[in-house]
């Protein structure tokens, strides 16, 4: 059985400003760096052998902090990038026009052909993150990889493993530096292939997440 751990990047400046990131970037906040350190402390006990990260700055920094803690090398994979949010990237959510908010809500509310102008669809996102995950099956026997990616990307990955369409309503919360685990196995009691063991674990973090504070 192959165990793969999934980690969302630490809190960023634009997360705190309620600004849409997508494939644009902003640095980790001090809290985000601390969150990544706490993931690293947890990762030391998980026997992680490989760290594979999105090549965007916020995930690279998160991966670097985790790698320092568990002594692993990092591989960067652009297929783990966040959903391309097109013309809405860098915009504050509260500044969107009614039309722009409608584009964004399509992705949240489950519109099959939803796409922000200039961006990508949820199906396109799903195809590439699943391809990145499939590459883990080529790692040496006994490997235990940890993937560092993004909220929408990882939410789409976990949801589609559970059998939902890529464009389904977003109902899975994966907070900054949450840890999820998926396993590849042959089972008499579960469908063969990828299964979800845990999703969105934040028990290793010692402070409330942004979405808890901004309610």
Curated annotation (Swiss-Prot):
Single Gene Ontology MF annotation: phosphatase activity
Disulfide feature: none
Residues of the site described as Transition state stabilizer: 150
SMART domains named in the record: PGAM
Pfam families reported for this sequence: His_Phos_1
SUPFAM superfamilies found in the cross-reference section: Phosphoglycerate mutase-like
GO biological process terms, semicolon-separated: glycolytic process
Reactions that this protein is recorded to catalyse: (2R)-2-phosphoglycerate = (2R)-3-phosphoglycerate
Family designation: Belongs to the phosphoglycerate mutase family. GpmB subfamily.
Protein name per the record: Probable phosphoglycerate mutase GpmB
UniProt source species: Salmonella choleraesuis (strain SC-B67)
Gene that encodes it: gpmB
């Amino acid at each position: 059985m192959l165990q793969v751990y999934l980690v969302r990047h630490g809190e960023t400046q634009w997360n705190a400003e309620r600004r849409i990131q997508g494939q644009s970037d902003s640095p980790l906040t001090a809290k985000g760096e601390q969150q990544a350190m706490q993931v690293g402390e947890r990762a030391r006990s998980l026997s992680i052998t490989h760290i594979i990260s999105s090549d965007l700055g916020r995930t690279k920094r998160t991966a670097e902090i985790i790698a320092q803690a568990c002594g692993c090398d990092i591989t960067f994979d652009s297929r783990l990038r966040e959903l391309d949010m097109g013309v809405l990237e860098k915009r504050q959510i509260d500044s969107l026009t009614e039309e722009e908010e409608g584009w964004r809500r399509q992705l949240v509310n489950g519109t099959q052909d939803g796409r922000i102008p200039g961006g990508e669809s949820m199906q396109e996102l799903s195809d590439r993150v699943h391809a990145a995950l499939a590459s883990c099956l080529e790692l040496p026997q006994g490997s235990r990889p940890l993937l560092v990616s993004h909220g929408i990307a990882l939410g789409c990955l976990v949801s589609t493993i559970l059998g939902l369409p890529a464009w389904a309503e977003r109902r899975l919360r994966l907070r900054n530096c949450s840890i999820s685990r998926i396993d590849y196995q042959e089972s008499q009691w579960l469908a063969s292939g990828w299964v979800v063991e845990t999703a969105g674990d934040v028990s290793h973090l010692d402070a409330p997440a942004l979405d808890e504070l901004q309610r």
